[in-house]
């Protein structure tokens, strides 16, 4: 049987898939099951300014599996700034960005609470404007793969 999907970490902050894997997936009609589209919660903004909420992933694993680097925080802030500039919930922006990709993506997200699940699902119909996508692309050029 042929491969139907691959599961890779994929988010605004982690785009290794964009190199050769995306081309293979398009050519072979393979869907990406992207995990951690919110980058372990980093793209929610909840960890900004040194905050570590009780019960959060960072409270259990301080470096989020090696994701916390010196280059991380400016990148996260830049994406949060794009969302803020356009009046978008950063969670909704990060999830909607997955649907802008030129290959098939189905995002696998995690929610610890029902409130988090409601927040994610309430943005399911968001379509990012070309302007927002261009600004996201500009941030990526400034901060490619911060971890």
Residue ranges and their predicted role:
Residues 1-138, 143:
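Beta/alpha (TIM)-barrel catalytic core signal, keyed to glycine-rich beta->alpha loops juxtaposed to Asp/Glu
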Residues 146:
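Substrate/cofactor-recognition hotspot
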């Amino acid at each position: 049987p042929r491969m139907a999907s691959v599961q890779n970490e994929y988010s605004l902050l982690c785009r290794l898939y964009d190199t050769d894997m995306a081309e293979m997936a398009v050519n072979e009609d393979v869907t990406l099951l992207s995990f951690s589209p919110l980058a372990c919660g980093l793209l929610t903004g909840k960890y900004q300014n040194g905050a570590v909420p009780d019960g959060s992933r960072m409270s259990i694993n301080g470096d989020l599996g090696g994701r916390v680097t010196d280059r991380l925080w400016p990148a996260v802030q830049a994406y949060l700034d794009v969302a803020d500039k356009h009046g978008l919930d950063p969670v909704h922006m990060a999830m909607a960005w997955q649907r802008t990709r030129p290959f098939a993506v189905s995002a696998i997200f995690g929610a610890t609470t029902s409130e988090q699940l409601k927040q994610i699902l309430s943005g399911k119909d968001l379509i990012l404007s070309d302007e927002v996508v261009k600004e996201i692309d500009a941030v990526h050029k400034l901060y490619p793969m911060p971890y």
